[in-house]
């Protein structure tokens, strides 16, 4: 028997999700168009947004669709950093792990190189786990300056 354990980058869709996706892919019409096919597609898109918002306990305006995880990580990391830094320019500290996925590490590095972010990496224990004492130290040391912890 084979067991697949790399669900970080891909996983099988549930049958109901696959059916819904296939049905949506058959629809014609750009959701930004004013013709009837576009309006029908827009209705499905907005109904999906409402369902996700309700399932997550979020506002519908907080549900943002993108093309995948890397794009989502970029939007989230940069958006949170910029928002925190805009509210308080001293909030430039990002705390992260050296074992984060590159979809996280790359925008963090970009913020350091281009936006003045100060990045601190949590130390790892010999077994590869995060050193939570070091994380606590970093939070205590930079508490008023933290923009983001990933």
Show where each model-derived region lies.
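Pyridoxal 5′-phosphate
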Residues: 1-150
């Amino acid at each position: 028997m084979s067991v697949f354990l790399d669900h970080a980058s891909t996983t099988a869709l549930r049958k109901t999700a696959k059916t819904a996706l296939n049905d949506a892919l058959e629809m014609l019409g750009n959701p930004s168009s004013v013709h009837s096919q576009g309006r029908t597609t827009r209705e499905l898109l907005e109904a999906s947004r409402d369902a996700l918002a309700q399932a997550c306990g979020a506002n519908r305006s907080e549900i943002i669709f993108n093309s995948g995880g890397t794009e989502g990580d970029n939007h989230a990391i940069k958006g949170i950093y910029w928002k925190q830094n805009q509210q308080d320019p001293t909030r430039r500290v990002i705390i992260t792990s050296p074992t984060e996925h590159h979809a996280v590490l790359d925008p963090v590095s970009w913020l350091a190189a281009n936006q003045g972010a100060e990045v601190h990496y949590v130390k790892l224990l010999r077994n590869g786990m995060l050193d939570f004492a070091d994380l606590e130290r970093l939070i205590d040391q930079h508490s008023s300056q933290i923009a983001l912890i990933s």
